């Protein structure tokens, strides 16, 4: 469900049409995107837009109840992983709802992206900077 105003019309539309438990993926510039998935390609150059900025913008619009990340993200890119977890904790506090965080192997993560309504590609070049958000409800 949408919460606010997002300038990117494709991303805004996808969020507005999400039902409870539907998923979207926000990924780095290198994650393979399945041909059958809707691709929202925001990448301009390396690092623009960043993964974290894209997550922040998405969270202003999307109510989430679950997060899936690759296990490798914690060990290979711990600083960015911690930034993401800080944003998730802030989102939990703001919406007063629990958000489940699940870790799966990266190869399994890539397969799981096929379930996403859309995959949002950023310009991020940090390894494993990918997240799947599961839509919640605002009530």
Curated annotation (Swiss-Prot):
Highest taxon of the lineage: Bacteria
Name of the top EC class for this enzyme: isomerase
One example GO MF annotation: monosaccharide binding
Location in or out of the cell: Cytoplasm
Binding positions for substrate per the UniProt entry: 28, 106, 128-130
Main location: cytoplasm
Pathway: Carbohydrate metabolism; D-ribose degradation; D-ribose 5-phosphate from beta-D-ribopyranose: step 1/2
GO cellular component: cytosol
Xref: InterPro entries: D-ribose_pyranase, RbsD-like_sf, RbsD_FucU
Catalytic activity: beta-D-ribopyranose = beta-D-ribofuranose
Residue pairs linked by disulfide bridges in the UniProt entry: none
This enzyme's EC code(s): 5.4.99.62
GO terms (BP aspect): D-ribose catabolic process
Keyword Cytoplasm: yes
Annotated function: Catalyzes the interconversion of beta-pyran and beta-furan forms of D-ribose.
Quaternary state and interactors: Homodecamer.
PANTHER family noted in UniProt: D-RIBOSE PYRANASE
Protein family (similarity comment): Belongs to the RbsD / FucU family. RbsD subfamily.
Name assigned to this protein: D-ribose pyranase
Provenance organism: Aliivibrio fischeri (strain ATCC 700601 / ES114) (Vibrio fischeri)
């Amino acid at each position: 469900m949408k919460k606010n105003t997002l300038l990117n019309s494709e991303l805004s539309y996808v969020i507005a049409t999400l039902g409870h438990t539907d998923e979207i993926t926000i990924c780095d510039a290198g994650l393979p995107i399945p041909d059958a998935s809707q691709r929202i390609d925001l990448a301009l150059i390396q690092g623009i837009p960043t993964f974290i900025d894209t997550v922040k913008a998405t969270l202003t619009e999307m109510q989430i109840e679950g997060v899936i990340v690759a296990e490798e993200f914690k060990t290979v890119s711990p600083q960015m992983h911690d930034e993401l977890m800080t944003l998730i904790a802030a989102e939990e506090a703001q919406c007063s709802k629990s958000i489940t965080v699940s870790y799966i192997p990266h190869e399994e993560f890539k397969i799981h992206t096929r379930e996403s309504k859309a995959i949002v590609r950023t310009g991020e070049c940090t390894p494993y900077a990918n997240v799947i958000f599961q839509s919640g409800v605002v009530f």
